[in-house]
Regions:
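Tryptophan-anchored aromatic micro-motifs
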Residues: 25-41, 114-118, 129-133
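Terminal, low-structured helical/coil segments at or just beyond the last alpha-helical repeat
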Residues: 200-232
């Protein structure tokens, strides 16, 4: 019996279909929640390519987009805005060649482009909140060694998905635990990245930051000022 043969046109169609499916699998991010590098936003991808992006920019301005990703691209309804998605391992690059049209989905000081990362299990919002609660419990019980081993990995391992303000509060908490455990030098070292801004007056800081951002940043820097004095 002769083996079955297919006309060249049919073979080409079958090959094109397989290539198309492979391309879709490669260029559509896996379902899950991805955090924008540096914090301040997330990308949620559902089965079938449905997605939702929400980010927060300067002065509380935001972006919000949703749609369906097809072959690495999503076109916004009733708009010329098209968003491109480039998965690479546990990251997804988000970009657009239609920035002007996509501005309709953002406040003046916000944007959504950039790298989005799938957080490790210890760096999800829920896991970080649990670590901070456990830290406080250990700190209040004066078990400073346990407090340090509970919170230090968050600052070290979750750096890429934390906002600057969140990192600042983590540093303040860790510095106090280090001080209470008798290591003032470690306290100063932990707070060193905050020292320059903490050394400025409130007025100087308000001249640097937009109003809403200043309201968020100032309490953290005031705590750093106090803790730097305690560690000195």
């Amino acid at each position: 019996m002769k083996p079955a043969t297919h006309p060249p046109a049919l073979l080409a169609a079958i090959l094109a279909c397989h290539i198309g499916l492979a391309s879709a699998q490669i260029t559509t991010p896996s379902p899950g929640t991805y955090v924008r590098k540096g914090g301040g936003g997330d990308l949620v991808v559902q089965a079938g390519g449905k997605f939702h992006i929400q980010t927060v920019g300067a002065n509380g301005h935001t972006c919000e987009l949703e749609g369906t990703i097809t072959n690495g691209r999503a076109r916004m309804a009733n708009s010329a805005c098209a968003v491109d998605f480039t998965p690479a391992g546990q990251r997804v690059g988000v970009d657009t060649a239609t920035a002007d049209a996509c501005r309709d989905f953002c406040g003046m000081r916000a944007w959504f482009g950039g790298d989005y990362l799938r957080p490790t299990p210890g760096c999800t919002d829920k896991a970080i909140a649990a670590s901070r609660r456990n830290f406080k419990r250990a700190y209040d019980a004066k078990d400073y060694r346990l407090a340090l081993t509970t919170l230090a990995p968050v600052l070290q391992d979750c750096d890429e998905v934390l906002t600057g303000v969140t990192k600042g509060w983590l540093r303040n908490d860790l510095a106090l635990a280090q001080l209470r455990s008798g290591d003032a030098a470690a306290c100063r070292q932990t707070l060193a990245p905050l020292a320059e801004e903490a050394g400025k007056t409130d007025q100087e800081l308000r001249e640097v930051y937009p109003p809403t951002d200043a309201d968020v940043v100032l309490p953290m820097l005031k705590a750093a000022r106090t803790n730097l004095r305690l560690c000195s």
